[in-house]
């Protein structure tokens, strides 16, 4: 058991180091992240880029509170909002009421996957589940205990949110806490009329 915790901590440390390097590179080079470029391109062209030009969102599998696997590919054919978060993260906590509101409004049409960054020490399934229950949130939560989803998405800082269209294309990315207006803008990109 200790070995799994150590491996999870090492994976999380690697994610954080790589994330810091990516953020530093982005700031120094002035380049946008792929999701930001897609958002800017879509707005500049007045419409979505042809699907062939859009990156396909990486599939991942994480586990729900009962230990059942949940994969992004399970939702193909439906727009998806993927949010990487942790219960100890203040900015993550600040955006959750907006996610809950939109989940209650659009949960039948848009899939919401709240991916908890479970490292086994600072963040455990138990602590995250307790936070969700105490806060009264009902959106789906999955646990990324090996950081594979975070690594696949380059979610190097928390919170990070991806907006994925029904065909599985990564349309936009938001790093840091987002407000209701930004969440709505992302939803409009993947589900017009949201």
Name the predicted role of every residue range.
Residues 1-56, 194:
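N-terminal targeting signals for export/organelle localization
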Residues 51-54, 59-80, 104:
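A short beta-strand-turn-helix
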Residues 60, 70, 75, 84-85, ...:
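Conserved hydrophobic/aromatic "anchor" residues
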Residues 76, 84-101:
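Conserved redox-active cysteine motifs that mediate thiol-disulfide chemistry
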Residues 78-79, 96-116, 133, 180-181, ...:
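Conserved helix-turn-beta segment immediately C-terminal to the redox Cys motif
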Residues 110-124, 137-146:
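Thiol-based oxidoreductase modules, predominantly thioredoxin-like and allied folds used
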Residues 129-167:
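Short, internal strand/loop/helix patches
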Residues 163-194:
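Thiol-/selenol-based redox modules, centered on thioredoxin-like
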């Amino acid at each position: 058991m200790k070995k799994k915790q150590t491996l999870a901590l090492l994976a999380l440390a690697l994610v954080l180091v790589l994330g810091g390097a990516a953020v530093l590179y982005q700031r120094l080079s002035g380049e946008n992240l792929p999701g930001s470029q897609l958002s800017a391109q879509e707005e500049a062209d007045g419409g979505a880029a042809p699907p062939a030009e859009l990156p396909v969102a990486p599939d991942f599998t994480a586990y729900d509170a009962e230990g059942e696997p949940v994969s992004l590919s399970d939702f193909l054919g439906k727009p998806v909002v993927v949010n990487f978060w942790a219960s100890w993260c203040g900015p993550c906590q600040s955006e959750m009421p907006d996610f809950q509101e939109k989940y209650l409004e659009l949960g039948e049409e848009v899939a919401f996957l709240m991916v908890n960054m479970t490292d086994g020490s600072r963040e455990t399934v138990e602590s995250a589940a307790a936070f969700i229950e105490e806060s009264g949130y009902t959106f789906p939560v999955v646990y990324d205990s090996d950081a594979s989803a975070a690594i696949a998405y380059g979610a190097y800082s928390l919170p990070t949110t991806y907006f994925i269209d029904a065909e599985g294309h990564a349309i936009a990315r938001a790093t840091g806490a987002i407000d209701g207006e930004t969440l709505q803008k992302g939803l409009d990109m993947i589900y017009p009329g949201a």
